[in-house]
Amino acid sequence: MNIKIAALTLAIASGISAQWAIAADMPASPAPTIPVKQYVTQVNADNSVTFRYFAPGAKNVSVVVGVPVPDNIHPMTKDEAGVWSWRTPILKGNLYEYFFNVDGVRSIDTGTAMTNPQRQVNSSMILVPGSYLDTRSVAHGDLIAITYHSNALQSERQMYVWTPPGYTGMGEPLPVLYFYHGFGDTGRSAIDQGRIPQIMDNLLAEGKIKPMLVVIPDTETDAKGIIPEDFVPQERRKVFYPLNAKAADRELMNDIIPLISKRFNVRKDADGRALAGLSQGGYQALVSGMNHLESFGWLATFSGVTTTTVPDEGVAARLNDPAAINQQLRNFTVVVGDKDVVTGKDIAGLKTELEQKKINFDYQEYPGLNHEMDVWRPAYAAFVQKLFK
């Protein structure tokens, strides 16, 4: 007999409630006399953050805030109620990503609703107010989730479209930015972690950007034989990235751009179309942007994988025609954190090649930063302020 069924039967026979018998096999819970605020993470009045984690049986708990490097690991202390905590110094306004290390096991914060919506969710987020990432009292655009059939991939797909406040589809056609997220992320990552809607709302309210649409496809195609989780990390550059980039490129040109052009009142000229992405999405932007140079007037890669480590014949051929690139692109932006250990060599190689071939580009290096959102959010905000002007 199943052990749980046997225990339940015994409990009922003994006059013990079935509810108690099931609960006895559940993890510990905070005492009902403790207010919830005493065992969940919170932003304090002075913009410090108190991280909390309820784990009365744990021996060691720490919180890792930001990129998982030694300086960002903070030991926590346990109180009599079994709540581990650590309070930060006063923080600047920003969105902070974090996770807990509980006796060697990585854990999200179960006391908050804000997790990073990756393909495998393994970190949480907390917003400290006081930056352009806030949801301010300004006119807000709309965020539309579109489910569609991709003929290129022969599957049902989803993408997100941000439209500016008051957009009705009437009047002059608007330009479009197509933005690709990074490896392991989803379209929601660009929205929730990247804060694209808030950035666009706030910059538009300040008159710093032109009205435009932002289209956020899923960088991962999940096509047959191109499932990210099927590849060990050592095979990503050699096998996965090239295969996925070609599939995503077909989807962009054959499905996504035609669908957006049909469903929304948007410009169809190259100067009215921008393409950008971060990390793996930066590689996607480079591949599609260079292979279809005539279709885009603006291009950006933020800490992107490049052909320095992942060759692409189309990109290589286009980079050998500097005059065509300089004539076609109104702006080509390349961004990286100077401590980037993931794609730093990629960007360095691309930068050298662009300089040697005298290809025009804007270059921004963020000091002291790694492969992280503290590079990509400011880079995104800076790039959209250049567009369509």
Curated annotation (Swiss-Prot):
SUPFAM superfamilies tied to this protein: alpha/beta-Hydrolases (SSF53474), E set domains (SSF81296)
GO molecular function (one): hydrolase activity, hydrolyzing O-glycosyl compounds
Gene: yieL
Pfam families: CBM_48, Esterase
Protein's name in the database: Uncharacterized protein YieL
Coiled coil residues, start to end: none
GO biological process, one term: carbohydrate metabolic process
